């Protein structure tokens, strides 16, 4: 996902580094939900950003049917950086998220890394799944 808004990039680059490390993922929640005006069940997709050190959920959002996940991911990252500064690093688990966030992170000086283990994030996702059951 290429970021073309240079004013946005400059504004974010001016934000201080906050020293935080974040975990970011877009898991499907394995609990089927009924969809309005349809007989098909859907598995909701959660976009969740966690502080890897505190541990705390910084933002979470259920992606709606038909909504572009790229817009959701970039919106969450931009909002975080504008409100709390640029994190020292962001850990993601999959190539899709890496591809969406890669250009923004590169242009704003934020390290983006793959990590198969996102312990804090997985703890919160498990808690959300348990609430559905």
Q: Where is each model-derived feature located?
A:
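Secondary-structure boundary/capping micro-motif
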Residues: 1-133
């Amino acid at each position: 996902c290429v970021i073309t808004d240079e004013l946005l990039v400059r504004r974010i680059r001016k934000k201080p580094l906050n020293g935080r490390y974040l975990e970011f993922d877009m898991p499907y929640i394995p609990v089927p939900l009924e969809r309005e005006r349809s007989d098909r069940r859907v598995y909701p997709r959660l976009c969740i950003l966690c502080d890897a050190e505190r541990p705390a959920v910084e933002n979470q959002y259920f992606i709606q049917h038909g909504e572009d996940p790229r817009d959701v991911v970039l919106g969450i990252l931009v909002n975080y950086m504008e409100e709390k500064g640029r994190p020292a690093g962001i850990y993601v688990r999959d190539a899709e998220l890496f591809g969406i966030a890669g250009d923004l992170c590169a242009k704003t000086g934020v390290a983006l890394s793959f990590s198969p283990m996102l312990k804090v994030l997985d703890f919160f996702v498990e808690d959300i799944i348990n609430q559905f059951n």
